[in-house]
Amino acid sequence: MKNFKIEAVIFDMDGLIIDSEPLWKIAEIEIFKEVGFDFTVEMCAMTTGMRIDEVVGFWRKKLNWKNFTTNEIVYKIQTKMIQLIKQKGKLLPGVYSALNLLKNNNISIALASSSSMSLINTTIETLEIRSFFNIVHSAENEIAGKPNPAVFLSTAKMLEINPDKCLVLEDSKAGMNAGLNANMRTIVIPELGTSPQWAKKGFKCLRTMLEFNLDLLN
């Protein structure tokens, strides 16, 4: 079996494994409307990749909401997201083949997401990919979400692999910065059809997961 410089690949979830960013937009716009605020798609984009409690906290502070607590709004959004994932969740192109490629080459595989464990579990069970992952970890258990590197550093610790031997796959700016802040090789796969300037800070930028290959581990 070939030896690689990289010993583990850590996947983000939303927008990388599952095409969930459109679902987050639906859930956020619907629930924010319930609390009396007309939220837009452009506003959703401002907090992509952040933990949902931090998203809600950001907008509560900015817009001075007082009629619902952060926890109440978070619960409503997460409940809606679980429903949407079960109804509409699907793997993004190339994910299954990338997971198979890594597993067949004995590379450790982890998932480190800003989403809650309930959302992570719903997603990987709905998509039937749980068996691929050695470790599944949520930033809800950390002091802060991405771009703070804590979720990636904790995942590496659980894998018992040094951060510089880990490769992160991300789609968002916050996630990319979290990977870089963790001193991990970070590959960006941004939203399909986009080529944001910030993505050039990563080790490499791929158009889709279909471009993933073992050469990226050396």
Enumerate the predicted regions with their spans.
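Metal-dependent phosphoesterase signature
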Residues: 38, 60-97
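An amphipathic alpha-helix signature
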Residues: 25, 29, 52-57, 74, ...
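Short coil/turn motifs that cap or connect alpha-helices
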Residues: 12, 38-39, 51, 162, ...
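Helix-loop "lid/cap" segments that line or gate small-molecule binding pockets
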Residues: 31-32, 51-66, 123, 155-156
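Active-site neighborhood of HAD-like aspartate-dependent phosphohydrolases
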Residues: 1-45
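Conserved SAM-binding loop
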Residues: 17, 91, 109-113, 144, ...
